[in-house]
Amino acid sequence: MAPCYCHLENRAALKIEGEDRKNLLQGLISNDALTLGRDRAAWAALLTPQGKFLHEFCLVEQGETLFLEGEAERLPDLTRRLTLYKLRSKVTLTPAPEFAVVALFGAGASEKAALPETAGAAKPVFDGIAFVDPRLPDLGLRALLPRDSFAATLESAGFEPEQSGAYERLRIGLGIPDGSRDLEIEKTTLMEAGFDELGGIDWKKGCFIGQELTARMRYRGLVKRRLV
């Protein structure tokens, strides 16, 4: 398959800015926010205090801004929840509709973006930022690109528009969940959804919301069902 692109219209971007941006997320989400940088993206989740799924998203940093890409329809709810925890932290949360979330996949996609096929590898490219999918490099790349020009930019770089839902078939075939389409809100746990195997949990980072149940399921082998 030639390198292709797919505009993920069900995903949207949020800008997280301010000197406390990483520290705020560090105590809330399942992955290590302190290790994020312009060369490393991560996949993470926000849980209920009881350890049940609320939101999943990718995070990547560019300059002094953390970009979060998550479910478009549910981004206001995620923003509201993060704001509740912000308190006096020096953090601002701003929707970024000027960016489109785009999947780049197929033979040679990473090479065209000059990225190694390493989960989470990231760099500024194509007038935005791209990163190898932090869950599984076989899924290709994610990119946050200017909405008005990404198609022309990518086609000039040798990417073709996807045909007949090729990216969705690839995602499903690899068993990669896509937000609340595949995970039950306030019901699914991270261990059931494969977050451990897909790099969505950092067990060394310290506490996060819902950590107690998540850790107990891991260390006591309490997982009774899994997403397949």
Name what the model sees in each region.
Residues M1-V228:
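Basic, glycine/lysine-rich polyanion-binding surfaces/domains
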